[in-house]
Amino acid sequence: MQPTDSNHSHHLAWLVGAMALLGLFLLGLDQSLLFDVDEGAFTEATREMLVSQDWGHTTLNGIDRFDKPIGVYWFQAICVAIFGLNEFAFRLPSALSGWLASLALARFAQKEWGGHAAVMAAIVSATSLGPWAMARTATADALLGLFFVLIFLDLWRSLENNHAWAGQRVALWVGLGFLVKGPVALVVPVGTLLIYWLFAPAYRLRIKLLILNLRSWLVFAVVALPWYVYAYLRHGRHFIEGFLLKHNVERFMGSMEGHSGHWAYFLIALPLLWLPWSALWLRALGNFKTHWENPFLKYCWIWFLFVFVFFTLANTKLPHYLLYAGPAMCFIIAYSSLHASRLTWILTWLLALLGLSILIMGPSYLHDYPEWVSDPYYKALLEGSPQTDMKVWIFALPLIIYVAPAFIFFLRLSKIANLKVKTSYLFFTLALYQSLVLSMVTLPWWSRTLQAPAHDLAMMFKEDQRVVVQWGVHLPSFATYRQQESPRREPMPGELALVKNIQPYWPPDWEILAVHGPLSIVKSPEIAKTNP
């Protein structure tokens, strides 16, 4: 075969692989209802922005919303304008972000360590439980994850090769991240650079030049600051207090919405977020000293450790905060796989099968034993959950034995990896199997279990033009599906209210219009007319 033919075949294989990966990210995107609170809040804010045509500000049920910057709402609104008001459109920006992040990681890994590492980086990014979940969630986190990947890669290119253009691209990505999520997009790379300056003396001059580059700061300012200036001019101190202080400073200094945790919180979350690949990270941890001698791996570990320590010190703790270390984790795991022993792969298989078994069998047991849950609201939801035979997918695992050879044959044919059969190729099929089952079976079950009452009541009253408030509940997806605002307050005379019915807290003379599981729609009586 001529070199040009070989290159053409190679590029075609990468195109096919990229399209297959896109299919994986789009798989089941519309199979699950929107999850409250986060997905409901983001999607309702986007819907209200489209209705008002006010593209510079968001509201939630008519109240100013300062939780996140404007960027994610723009992306969601564009997709909704194209594909309609549905779960697929709301989640599409996250899915595309996960896909592009995986491709960027694969491209870098291919140049750094070869074709096998490229496939590893892409599959790890696409199938690990945490990144997989974020790519199917209509929030800002997958978009921020994409920008963190691009920041991570271009930051290293700038340090390693002293590329001025790469440094300015970093400023662009940081600006976009700032527009999507806020100051954390700047804190993580700057914090990583400062620590790398301490441990890598050879790079100190380049780090200094990168941080003090006025052109890069200008790029950042042009991208990120116009909306912030507009928001401040429009809302004044309310924007400062609502966004910068409450949703940034207070998240670090105090616990918001009950999301606190022990200092060891992320030690528990870490192996769960990176299933089924967690054992490879544990092996990398054992080789930390060897990795530290490699400048790029040192950079990966410093990025990871900064994220881990910074958010461990924060009082508000959420699992997805650890995903800000995503690009570093993907490369650490990919590199570890290149040198993994047979024993390491056996442990990886065992831990992955254990994790997948719990994820698949958990719903069946919770359905059969809802008394395991103490919260009466969630206990009632589980009691009304759909019957599931999900555990049958555990017994389908042997199918991997038949699917794996076809996957290996594709890799050989495409010349993406060398011709030698590697143990990791067999494990790819388990990772893909996990994504398939979770996307098409497990996640839809959880969405019906947790969200069906709110969704079905919203659809029941969608054509009803009367005001329906949320009283004693916070389920913003109810407003998204009903396509009408649903303020959180006590109902006024004659208004309807979405309430929890486990322990009724409304007066006995109120009319109950509909009941679905632990939720009801009730109507407050009109003000009685008095005789003159």
Predicted regions span which residues?
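Membrane-integral, polyisoprenol-dependent glycosyltransferases
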Residues: 1-344, 363, 514-522
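Membrane-embedded architecture of ER/inner-membrane glycosylation machinery
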Residues: 2, 10, 168, 287-532
